[in-house]
Amino acid sequence: MRNLKQTAIALATLLNTTACGITPTATLMTLPTSAGDHSYTLQAAAAGQGKTSGANRWMTQPAQGVRTQFRTFYSQAARSEVSYHLYVPAAYEQQRRQRFPVLYWLHGTGAGTSAIPFLTEQIDQAIRAGKLPPMLVVFPNGQDISMWSNSKDGKTPMETVVVKELVPHLDRTFRTQAQREGRLLEGMSMGGYGAARLGFEHSQTFGAISMLGAGPLDLAFQGPKAEANPALREGVLSVTFGNDMAYYQKLSPWRTAERQARHLRGRLKLRMLIGERDFTLADNEAFRQHLSKLGLRHEYRTVPGVGHKLEGLVTALGDEYWTFFRNALNAR
């Protein structure tokens, strides 16, 4: 294995690119702050948008998005202020006695906040057109390579921060539908991995899971991306999993699905979307077959002409993209 300095330099190079090919744009709104939560008004899109703020990995730079706020809360687990972004639909202000479902959207490796401008614009348009029920959308800060998991060394308790602290914080601070049926999970790439892992492990908290180009899903962590970028694989294994393949496998969606299968059968709402040109296609196909063998029903769709790109998946499916969320919420 290369030395840590070389790995760090290679990781910095890999992660210093624009994720998903999305250019940040859009507008902003603000809401009054609540106790324990801090809201900030955003100005022009900041250079370095989506990167962590200084030495504090738990804080990102503010990103702009349609009807989007940059907010923070104090995490006991992280012993730090932690940032997140929040999309708030117009109906939240107009219907003050109503409670709203919440979509937790998990970003990919090194992607930070780069998807927020595109996604909030698409979500806002879908809600205004009646294609998607009004909902809050939370964009947690998953750092660069957390895998949305608690790191083995305890320094990055990401799963605890998101599930045990951020979710209750949102329920205290906003008029949410504070039960599993009112909470949705979606993520791209590392975020798809995280959506599956957290959704399977905490099925009492989340009612529906949407995986987009999810990975890594193989138990050996030897997929095409890992082979093409060995420094990234080494960094993830070292920083998050303590170079312990047994720990990596224990936390994997593959093993988590096996452990939780009896709790998930009959109540799991799961969608898998994958571009036909996505390098994770083979691993997603294998994972789909694994879920079927476990008796876990799910939607699975490959999208022609699309690679490992969020924007490509959403654009290619058009209005159909929102059907999964509508059905998940209407089935309650």
Which residues does each predicted region cover?
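Bacterial N-terminal signal peptides
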Residues: 10-18
